[in-house]
Amino acid sequence: GVGYCDTAKMLTNWRSSEELGFLSEVSVVPLQQSLRHLQSAFSNFWKKTSRYPRFKSRKKSVLSLEYSRSGFRIKNGEVYLAKMKEPLDIVWSRECDINSASTITVKCDKAGRWFISLLCESRVEEKPITGKTVGIDLGVKDAVVLSDGKKLNPDRRAQKKNEERIKRGQKALARKQKDSKNWEKARLKLSRAYARYTDAKRDWLHKTTTYLVNTYDVLCIEDLNVSGMTRKVSGEGRSAKSGLNRSILSNNLSELRFMLEYKSQWYGKECVAIDRFFPSSQRCSECGYINQELTLNDRHWTCSECGTHHDRDINAAKNIKAAGLAVIACGDGARLES
Protein backbone atom coordinates (compact mmCIF):
# COMPACT_ATOMS: atom_id res chain seq x y z
CA GLY A 1 0.00 0.00 0.00
CA VAL A 2 0.85 3.67 -0.12
CA GLY A 3 2.17 4.93 3.21
CA TYR A 4 3.38 8.23 4.61
CA CYS A 5 6.87 7.92 3.10
CA ASP A 6 5.37 7.48 -0.38
CA THR A 7 3.01 10.44 -0.06
CA ALA A 8 5.82 12.60 1.40
CA LYS A 9 7.86 11.94 -1.78
CA MET A 10 4.81 12.85 -3.86
CA LEU A 11 4.50 16.09 -1.89
CA THR A 12 8.08 17.02 -2.77
CA ASN A 13 7.30 16.55 -6.47
CA TRP A 14 4.02 18.47 -6.19
CA ARG A 15 5.76 21.46 -4.59
CA SER A 16 8.25 21.66 -7.46
CA SER A 17 5.66 21.21 -10.23
CA GLU A 18 4.18 24.11 -12.20
CA GLU A 19 0.57 23.11 -11.53
CA LEU A 20 0.92 22.71 -7.74
CA GLY A 21 3.83 25.08 -7.16
CA PHE A 22 1.67 27.21 -4.84
CA LEU A 23 2.23 24.54 -2.17
CA SER A 24 5.82 25.78 -1.80
CA GLU A 25 4.54 29.20 -0.71
CA VAL A 26 3.70 27.80 2.73
CA SER A 27 5.65 25.74 5.23
CA VAL A 28 5.96 22.06 4.40
CA VAL A 29 5.31 21.08 8.04
CA PRO A 30 1.47 21.41 8.12
CA LEU A 31 1.32 19.67 4.72
CA GLN A 32 3.33 16.76 6.12
CA GLN A 33 1.10 16.67 9.20
CA SER A 34 -1.96 16.38 6.92
CA LEU A 35 -0.36 13.35 5.25
CA ARG A 36 0.31 11.80 8.67
CA HIS A 37 -3.35 12.33 9.62
CA LEU A 38 -4.36 10.70 6.33
CA GLN A 39 -2.23 7.65 7.10
CA SER A 40 -3.71 7.43 10.62
CA ALA A 41 -7.24 7.63 9.20
CA PHE A 42 -6.62 4.74 6.80
CA SER A 43 -4.80 2.72 9.49
CA ASN A 44 -7.82 3.09 11.78
CA PHE A 45 -10.10 2.05 8.93
CA TRP A 46 -8.10 -1.14 8.23
CA LYS A 47 -8.09 -1.88 11.99
CA LYS A 48 -11.91 -1.50 11.84
CA THR A 49 -11.88 1.16 14.56
CA SER A 50 -13.34 3.86 12.29
CA ARG A 51 -15.10 4.18 8.95
CA TYR A 52 -13.58 4.86 5.55
CA PRO A 53 -11.98 8.34 5.39
CA ARG A 54 -14.14 10.90 3.62
CA PHE A 55 -13.00 13.76 1.43
CA LYS A 56 -13.04 17.04 3.35
CA SER A 57 -14.60 19.93 1.47
CA ARG A 58 -12.81 23.25 1.83
CA LYS A 59 -16.16 25.04 2.20
CA LYS A 60 -17.62 22.78 4.88
CA SER A 61 -14.54 21.81 6.89
CA VAL A 62 -12.91 23.78 9.70
CA LEU A 63 -9.70 25.34 8.40
CA SER A 64 -6.77 24.10 10.48
CA LEU A 65 -2.98 23.83 10.32
CA GLU A 66 -0.87 21.67 12.60
CA TYR A 67 2.79 22.50 13.23
CA SER A 68 5.21 20.07 14.85
CA ARG A 69 8.23 21.42 16.78
CA SER A 70 10.24 22.03 13.59
CA GLY A 71 7.51 24.30 12.21
CA PHE A 72 7.53 27.03 14.87
CA ARG A 73 9.83 28.84 17.27
CA ILE A 74 9.29 30.70 20.51
CA LYS A 75 11.29 33.82 21.24
CA ASN A 76 10.81 36.20 24.17
CA GLY A 77 7.43 34.65 24.93
CA GLU A 78 6.15 35.12 21.37
CA VAL A 79 5.22 32.47 18.80
CA TYR A 80 6.64 32.54 15.28
CA LEU A 81 5.35 30.09 12.66
CA ALA A 82 7.52 28.84 9.79
CA LYS A 83 7.83 31.33 6.89
CA MET A 84 6.48 34.16 9.08
CA LYS A 85 8.67 37.13 9.98
CA GLU A 86 6.31 38.62 12.56
CA PRO A 87 5.05 36.86 15.71
CA LEU A 88 1.40 35.90 16.10
CA ASP A 89 -0.78 38.50 17.82
CA ILE A 90 -2.25 36.28 20.54
CA VAL A 91 -4.71 37.01 23.34
CA TRP A 92 -4.02 34.14 25.75
CA SER A 93 -7.02 32.47 27.40
CA ARG A 94 -4.90 30.97 30.17
CA GLU A 95 -1.34 30.80 31.45
CA CYS A 96 0.84 28.00 30.11
CA ASP A 97 4.50 27.15 29.67
CA ILE A 98 4.70 27.85 25.94
CA ASN A 99 8.36 26.82 25.86
CA SER A 100 7.28 23.21 26.50
CA ALA A 101 4.89 23.17 23.51
CA SER A 102 5.44 20.18 21.22
CA THR A 103 2.64 20.90 18.74
CA ILE A 104 0.75 24.01 17.67
CA THR A 105 -2.60 23.91 15.88
CA VAL A 106 -4.01 27.00 14.19
CA LYS A 107 -7.74 26.98 13.40
CA CYS A 108 -10.30 29.29 11.83
CA ASP A 109 -13.91 28.54 12.77
CA LYS A 110 -17.00 29.22 10.66
CA ALA A 111 -17.48 32.55 12.42
CA GLY A 112 -14.13 33.73 11.01
CA ARG A 113 -12.32 33.62 14.38
CA TRP A 114 -8.74 32.37 14.55
CA PHE A 115 -7.53 30.19 17.42
CA ILE A 116 -4.18 28.72 18.36
CA SER A 117 -3.87 25.70 20.66
CA LEU A 118 -0.60 24.43 22.12
CA LEU A 119 0.09 20.89 23.28
CA CYS A 120 2.03 21.36 26.52
CA GLU A 121 2.89 19.26 29.55
CA SER A 122 1.27 20.52 32.73
CA ARG A 123 1.09 19.08 36.23
CA VAL A 124 -2.44 19.17 37.66
CA GLU A 125 -2.53 19.53 41.43
CA GLU A 126 -5.23 17.70 43.38
CA LYS A 127 -7.91 19.83 45.03
CA PRO A 128 -8.19 20.04 48.85
CA ILE A 129 -10.35 17.37 50.50
CA THR A 130 -13.75 18.69 51.58
CA GLY A 131 -15.31 15.47 52.92
CA LYS A 132 -18.56 16.23 51.07
CA THR A 133 -20.65 13.93 48.87
CA VAL A 134 -23.38 15.11 46.52
CA GLY A 135 -26.05 13.58 44.33
CA ILE A 136 -26.61 15.33 41.00
CA ASP A 137 -29.88 15.19 39.09
CA LEU A 138 -29.55 16.42 35.50
CA GLY A 139 -32.81 17.60 34.05
CA VAL A 140 -34.79 19.91 31.80
CA LYS A 141 -36.50 22.59 33.92
CA ASP A 142 -33.38 22.92 36.07
CA ALA A 143 -30.16 21.85 34.40
CA VAL A 144 -28.39 20.70 37.59
CA VAL A 145 -30.10 19.94 40.91
CA LEU A 146 -28.00 18.91 43.93
CA SER A 147 -29.00 16.73 46.86
CA ASP A 148 -28.30 19.61 49.27
CA GLY A 149 -31.07 21.65 47.60
CA LYS A 150 -29.03 23.86 45.26
CA LYS A 151 -30.26 24.38 41.69
CA LEU A 152 -27.76 25.49 39.03
CA ASN A 153 -28.91 26.96 35.73
CA PRO A 154 -27.38 28.95 32.88
CA ASP A 155 -28.61 32.49 32.23
CA ARG A 156 -31.92 31.63 30.56
CA ARG A 157 -32.57 35.23 29.50
CA ALA A 158 -29.22 35.49 27.68
CA GLN A 159 -29.77 32.02 26.22
CA LYS A 160 -33.15 33.09 24.82
CA LYS A 161 -31.63 36.24 23.29
CA ASN A 162 -28.96 34.15 21.58
CA GLU A 163 -31.61 31.76 20.25
CA GLU A 164 -33.58 34.70 18.86
CA ARG A 165 -30.45 36.02 17.12
CA ILE A 166 -29.99 32.61 15.50
CA LYS A 167 -33.61 32.53 14.30
CA ARG A 168 -33.28 36.01 12.78
CA GLY A 169 -30.00 35.02 11.16
CA GLN A 170 -31.54 31.87 9.66
CA LYS A 171 -34.41 33.88 8.17
CA ALA A 172 -32.02 36.50 6.75
CA LEU A 173 -29.82 33.80 5.20
CA ALA A 174 -32.83 32.08 3.60
CA ARG A 175 -33.73 35.31 1.77
CA LYS A 176 -30.30 35.64 0.13
CA GLN A 177 -29.13 34.06 -3.11
CA LYS A 178 -26.72 31.26 -2.26
CA ASP A 179 -22.99 32.00 -2.70
CA SER A 180 -23.63 35.72 -3.36
CA LYS A 181 -21.73 38.38 -1.38
CA ASN A 182 -24.81 39.22 0.68
CA TRP A 183 -25.38 35.50 1.33
CA GLU A 184 -21.80 35.18 2.63
CA LYS A 185 -22.28 38.22 4.90
CA ALA A 186 -25.51 36.71 6.27
CA ARG A 187 -23.84 33.31 6.71
CA LEU A 188 -20.96 34.88 8.66
CA LYS A 189 -23.40 36.80 10.88
CA LEU A 190 -25.36 33.61 11.57
CA SER A 191 -22.14 31.70 12.34
CA ARG A 192 -21.16 34.38 14.85
CA ALA A 193 -24.58 34.10 16.51
CA TYR A 194 -24.11 30.32 16.77
CA ALA A 195 -20.59 30.84 18.15
CA ARG A 196 -21.84 33.22 20.84
CA TYR A 197 -24.55 30.72 21.79
CA THR A 198 -22.23 27.70 22.02
CA ASP A 199 -19.46 29.67 23.76
CA ALA A 200 -21.90 30.80 26.46
CA LYS A 201 -23.10 27.22 27.03
CA ARG A 202 -19.57 25.83 27.17
CA ASP A 203 -18.47 28.58 29.56
CA TRP A 204 -21.35 27.74 31.92
CA LEU A 205 -20.56 24.01 31.73
CA HIS A 206 -16.91 24.60 32.63
CA LYS A 207 -17.72 26.95 35.51
CA THR A 208 -20.40 24.62 36.89
CA THR A 209 -18.32 21.42 36.71
CA THR A 210 -15.28 23.20 38.19
CA TYR A 211 -17.45 24.45 41.07
CA LEU A 212 -18.70 20.91 41.71
CA VAL A 213 -15.26 19.25 41.81
CA ASN A 214 -13.95 22.08 44.01
CA THR A 215 -16.82 21.74 46.49
CA TYR A 216 -17.39 17.97 46.70
CA ASP A 217 -15.16 14.90 46.94
CA VAL A 218 -17.69 12.33 45.67
CA LEU A 219 -20.09 13.20 42.85
CA CYS A 220 -22.94 10.79 42.11
CA ILE A 221 -24.75 11.10 38.77
CA GLU A 222 -27.17 9.09 36.64
CA ASP A 223 -25.99 7.14 33.60
CA LEU A 224 -28.40 8.97 31.30
CA ASN A 225 -29.23 7.67 27.83
CA VAL A 226 -29.58 11.06 26.11
CA SER A 227 -30.07 9.58 22.62
CA GLY A 228 -32.94 7.46 23.97
CA MET A 229 -34.44 10.40 25.87
CA THR A 230 -34.49 12.52 22.70
CA ARG A 231 -35.85 9.85 20.36
CA LYS A 232 -38.55 11.19 18.02
CA VAL A 233 -42.17 10.07 18.33
CA SER A 234 -44.98 10.09 15.79
CA GLY A 235 -48.66 10.87 16.15
CA GLU A 236 -50.21 12.55 19.17
CA GLY A 237 -47.79 14.46 21.40
CA ARG A 238 -45.19 14.86 18.65
CA SER A 239 -44.97 18.65 19.03
CA ALA A 240 -44.60 18.50 22.83
CA LYS A 241 -41.92 15.79 22.54
CA SER A 242 -39.98 17.92 20.03
CA GLY A 243 -39.97 20.81 22.51
CA LEU A 244 -38.83 18.49 25.31
CA ASN A 245 -36.04 17.13 23.09
CA ARG A 246 -34.80 20.66 22.36
CA SER A 247 -34.74 21.47 26.07
CA ILE A 248 -32.80 18.29 26.90
CA LEU A 249 -30.24 18.90 24.14
CA SER A 250 -29.83 22.59 25.06
CA ASN A 251 -28.67 21.57 28.56
CA ASN A 252 -25.81 19.50 27.09
CA LEU A 253 -26.23 16.70 29.64
CA SER A 254 -23.71 14.37 27.98
CA GLU A 255 -21.01 17.04 27.81
CA LEU A 256 -21.64 18.03 31.43
CA ARG A 257 -21.13 14.43 32.56
CA PHE A 258 -18.00 14.11 30.39
CA MET A 259 -16.50 17.24 32.00
CA LEU A 260 -17.39 16.02 35.49
CA GLU A 261 -15.68 12.69 34.88
CA TYR A 262 -12.40 13.99 33.49
CA LYS A 263 -12.13 16.84 36.02
CA SER A 264 -12.80 14.39 38.86
CA GLN A 265 -9.96 12.25 37.54
CA TRP A 266 -7.67 15.26 37.22
CA TYR A 267 -8.24 16.62 40.70
CA GLY A 268 -8.39 13.38 42.69
CA LYS A 269 -12.17 13.33 43.18
CA GLU A 270 -14.57 10.42 42.55
CA CYS A 271 -17.43 10.51 40.03
CA VAL A 272 -19.90 7.61 40.29
CA ALA A 273 -22.57 6.83 37.67
CA ILE A 274 -25.58 4.83 38.86
CA ASP A 275 -27.82 2.55 36.79
CA ARG A 276 -29.96 4.53 34.33
CA PHE A 277 -32.99 2.36 35.22
CA PHE A 278 -32.82 3.21 38.93
CA PRO A 279 -36.17 4.97 39.80
CA SER A 280 -34.57 8.03 41.38
CA SER A 281 -37.58 10.33 40.81
CA GLN A 282 -40.26 7.83 41.89
CA ARG A 283 -38.58 6.61 45.08
CA CYS A 284 -39.20 8.45 48.35
CA SER A 285 -35.79 9.43 49.74
CA GLU A 286 -37.13 9.12 53.32
CA CYS A 287 -38.83 5.70 53.40
CA GLY A 288 -38.04 4.08 50.03
CA TYR A 289 -41.64 3.88 48.80
CA ILE A 290 -41.91 3.94 44.97
CA ASN A 291 -44.64 6.14 43.51
CA GLN A 292 -45.57 4.38 40.26
CA GLU A 293 -48.14 7.05 39.35
CA LEU A 294 -45.63 9.93 39.17
CA THR A 295 -45.62 11.70 35.77
CA LEU A 296 -43.26 14.21 34.13
CA ASN A 297 -45.71 17.01 34.92
CA ASP A 298 -45.56 16.33 38.68
CA ARG A 299 -42.89 18.75 40.01
CA HIS A 300 -43.86 18.12 43.66
CA TRP A 301 -45.43 15.10 45.33
CA THR A 302 -46.26 13.75 48.79
CA CYS A 303 -45.33 10.21 49.81
CA SER A 304 -48.46 8.20 50.65
CA GLU A 305 -46.47 6.02 53.08
CA CYS A 306 -44.58 8.50 55.28
CA GLY A 307 -46.25 11.80 54.29
CA THR A 308 -43.01 13.53 53.26
CA HIS A 309 -43.51 16.32 50.71
CA HIS A 310 -40.90 16.23 47.93
CA ASP A 311 -39.50 18.55 45.33
CA ARG A 312 -39.24 16.05 42.47
CA ASP A 313 -35.68 16.92 41.40
CA ILE A 314 -34.17 17.38 44.88
CA ASN A 315 -35.69 14.04 45.92
CA ALA A 316 -34.13 12.41 42.84
CA ALA A 317 -30.74 13.94 43.68
CA LYS A 318 -30.94 12.57 47.24
CA ASN A 319 -31.72 9.09 45.89
CA ILE A 320 -28.84 9.35 43.40
CA LYS A 321 -26.49 10.25 46.26
CA ALA A 322 -27.62 7.24 48.32
CA ALA A 323 -27.35 4.94 45.30
CA GLY A 324 -23.88 6.25 44.46
CA LEU A 325 -22.64 5.62 47.99
CA ALA A 326 -24.09 2.09 47.78
CA VAL A 327 -22.19 1.48 44.53
CA ILE A 328 -18.95 2.64 46.17
CA ALA A 329 -19.56 0.43 49.22
CA CYS A 330 -20.47 -2.67 47.20
CA GLY A 331 -18.06 -2.20 44.28
CA ASP A 332 -18.49 -1.14 40.65
CA GLY A 333 -20.20 -4.40 39.71
CA ALA A 334 -23.11 -3.82 42.09
CA ARG A 335 -26.59 -3.45 40.60
CA LEU A 336 -29.15 -1.49 42.57
CA GLU A 337 -32.56 -3.01 43.11
CA SER A 338 -35.65 -1.04 42.13
What feature does the model see in each segment?
Residues 94-100, 109-338:
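Positively charged, helix-rich recognition surfaces that bind polyanionic ligands
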Residues 4-109, 240, 246:
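Acidic carboxylate diad motif detector
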Residues 1-10, 175, 179:
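N-terminal structural subdomain of ketosynthase/condensing enzymes
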